[in-house]
């Protein structure tokens, strides 16, 4: 703590043999202000250090809280699926979906017991035992918190006490205080002798002016006062020693009682711990046996499911092979029948084309023969008509030769011949046209006959094709029936395959669930063992901390007892010193020492110590504006009466300018 103090300024004080001056009073006030500033500076440094420690602890606690929250969220995710109650499911879903860490920590802190119960329910462990353990741990934590609070309070009291002691040491080390009280640390006895010698010299000087009787009376009074003071000192020392002896005996008896109580509690705690360990071992052993039995039964079920799965796989493979063989047979038979039908159809088509060509050839020959027959008949008719006309011409020529004289008739005959030729020419033309028409008609009839033959052939081929189509439709219906039957068989096989697949997937899911349950049980066992180890370690750590706290508590109690004893001793010494001062003051007043140097020094002491306004209370508040010191009662009264000016220098001040000091 001395590192935080500022270097003390060097004060220029008057000679201790001389009475106090105004400079000594100002130096005394300045040093009091300096001590107060040092005190507040030390407190500020302590607060800064505590703030740093608390910030580091807060960061660690936030990290640990975030880790605990993440682990709780992971546990909640693993527990949600196995939870049956809808409210618990909603609560766990809300816990999983919350992203803000502050709200998550609030939810977990408000519902810690509920979360523990849910995790323990789903884990399948014994809830009552775990809740009992949690309650024991919570009670232990509460007791530890109470112990920590009490130890912190005691530590605060101890720090305050030590700060007061340091302030006393600072006051003892200060030159101004030693100058005021005439008690310097280095040579107190010498100063007392000097004071006594100076006082005696002053008294002698003054008494030299007076009569010898007054000097003898003064010396006798002073010696009597010194004798009484020594007796009072011895009495105070005796009372202090008696009080210390009483305190020590009481403290000894109290410590013996506490020791016996602690031994009894330690023995009871040991027995309780041994019983708890036996109970925990007896509980863990059946739990381990139950888990082993569960694992063995689950492994057997897993093996049985694997065997069933293998049987289903072999059946599935056989069915798939039979299906492939059946499909191959059907396809081969269908292809063979289709190829034979195609070949038969092609041969029939070839025969039909061949028959049609032969038929066309025969029909053409018949039509040609018929056409040739008609032309020969027409030629014969024409020849007959020509022969008839030639015969008629010959008859006419014979007639003309017989009748030569008939020229006129000849001309008429020639004209008739011309007309006949023209008529014959026209008839020939008509006959040629008629022949052409007949040829066209014959051709058309031939074509008609061909077309009719083709039609009849087509009809015959149509009938054959219809018969073939009927046969093919019958074959197609049979093949369709076969295909439908095959499709039905395929559907049944597919349903069987789907059922086999479903059974296979169910068996695989069951196997996965069994494996996951095995993993979860193993993980839970590992977690429980780790938690058990952690709890054991935490209990050991808490026990060690409690031991350390008990040790520190006993040390602090012993220190507090020592300081109480010292305080009582100091109180007794202060009371004796006050009695001494009162007696000395009375002796001085009775000996007429008001005009002396000692009386003046005491008056200066009173002006330094007591308030100049009321002269009743000690000076304990300084004004920051001017540095003058008064009692807090007078300052508050002046502020209440709106007299907000210093009574010595008339400088204004407010309630914020008041500074508490210790002279």
UniProtKB/Swiss-Prot annotation:
Keywords: Chromatin regulator, Coiled coil, Metal-binding, Nucleus, Transferase, Ubl conjugation pathway, Zinc, Zinc-finger. Its main location: nucleus. It comes from Kluyveromyces lactis (strain ATCC 8585 / CBS 2359 / DSM 70799 / NBRC 1267 / NRRL Y-1140 / WM37) (Yeast). Belongs to the BRE1 family. Residues 133-172, 225-424, 463-588 form a coiled coil. PROSITE patterns: ZF_RING_2. GO terms for biological process: chromatin organization; protein ubiquitination. Pathway: Protein modification; protein ubiquitination. One of its GO terms (molecular function) is zinc ion binding. InterPro entries: E3_ubiquit_lig_Bre1, Znf_C3HC4_RING-type, Znf_RING, Znf_RING/FYVE/PHD. Signal peptide: none annotated. Residues 273-285 have a biased composition (Low complexity). It catalyses: S-ubiquitinyl-[E2 ubiquitin-conjugating enzyme]-L-cysteine + [acceptor protein]-L-lysine = [E2 ubiquitin-conjugating enzyme]-L-cysteine + N(6)-ubiquitinyl-[acceptor protein]-L-lysine. It is found in: Nucleus. The gene is BRE1. Residues 176-225, 273-293 are annotated as: Disordered. Its EC number is 2.3.2.27. A zinc finger (RING-type) spans 611-650. This is E3 ubiquitin-protein ligase BRE1. It is an enzyme of class 2 (transferase).
